[in-house]
Amino acid sequence: MLILSDIPGVNIEDEKSLSKLRRLLSEYRLDQLILIGEVLPKVAAQFDVPSISYSDTAAFLANIRSLSFENATVLLKGGREFHFERISQLLVAKSHDTVLEINLNALENNLNVYRQLLPKQVKLMTMVKAFSYGSGSFEIANLLQFNRVDYLTVAFADEGVDLRGAGIKLPIVVMSPDESSFESIVQYNLEPEIYSFRILFSFLNFLKTKQITSFPIHIKIDTGMHRLGFMPDEVDRLIAVLRAEAVLEVKSAFSHLASAGNEKDREFTQQQIDLLDEFTKRLESGLGYSFLRHIAATSGIELWPNAYFDMVRLGIGLYGIDIERHDLPIREASTLKTNVTQIKYLPASETVGYNRHGVLYRDSKIATIKIGYADGYDRRFGNGVGKMLVNGFLVPTIGDICMDMCMLDVTDVEVGEEDEVIVYPDIKSAAKAIGTIPYELLTSISQRVKRVYFYE
């Protein structure tokens, strides 16, 4: 569902603007369109999407209870004077659920910041694996497709199948293909990463049974990460196999920097870059054709311009988190929010939660909030380790984290039931508190947590 307002300065009745909007709407494959303003409702019949029109935001809000948002992904795009933040707040309040808000303006900003670091000829691959770092695969992939990135990357073939089913047409690389996924890879025009002779021969044999030729693949090279990939001394055998078969076409060869952000490992990182350069030059010479080369992910983009080669891979930096260069105008794109379900006033010596671990040493005000470990809030955040933001103040957890809820000590804060709670005011600090990284916190957010996407 898209909720769209008139855009100041844009004459939507102009055929050029109208045509562009029709194209955008077709790319989003909408089930319903809600139009707000004086101009858009006049051209509603021009869109091949069921629509409802309102004269202004107040009129929409007055009728919001008559609309169903169950199981819907809602995208808001409104001019500032339409104050769509009121709609976002009401949609979240209507559900009284924990939500992950994704700011699409911030995502686009971050994408453009990294693009500006790159020479024009360098292509951009973006990572949408692991539910796009928790942010929602199709919605983020659609934004990236609209912004014309060159490649998308997923971990498993079923993620790529879902994106194809949702209308994503960009090339999609599958990082962890296996024999059971070959059929889907071919059927949905996905491009597998080939990292060993076992997977290479298995895929070759599969393609031969289907009488398929020139199928695109991406060669993974182990330059020092020692996770997946062909070792440098295997290049001659790899060339021999690929030359003997007309079944495969190498679209790229790549590796992964193990420690690009660590100053102490600069020599090791340079060795990895040099190894990729040497391996790929030999591979290109042996095959008799060129392909894309890439090794730099987010940290590499920020710190290693000599590692750009032909393409770079943007992952966590797209979401504005865990970056190495603090001079970049990056914005955090996601905010995990919940609300206060109940407040209790308890005397000193009472205990809170399972196993009575939350001991009160003073008369206290305790807030129960609607997030637990089934939502992806780690149990290690219990008993004061986790800190959340309530009405501008950091407050600690108290007691063990429950499956669907947890408790906060809000004794020193003015707070009421249904007040908003920011779960990770500083996600890097939160990750450090339990000895992990922001990636894990983001990718652990359960899919039962609603995702709310908005443009400012």
Q: Predicted regions span which residues?
A:
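Short beta-strand segments
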Residues: 3-5, 75-77, 127, 218-222, ...
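Short, ordered loop/turn segments at secondary-structure junctions
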Residues: 5-8, 35-41, 79, 130-131, ...
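Residue-level signal for inorganic ion chemistry
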Residues: 6, 33, 76, 163, ...
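Active-site-proximal beta-alpha core segment in soluble small-molecule metabolic enzymes
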Residues: 99-101, 106-108, 122-292, 308
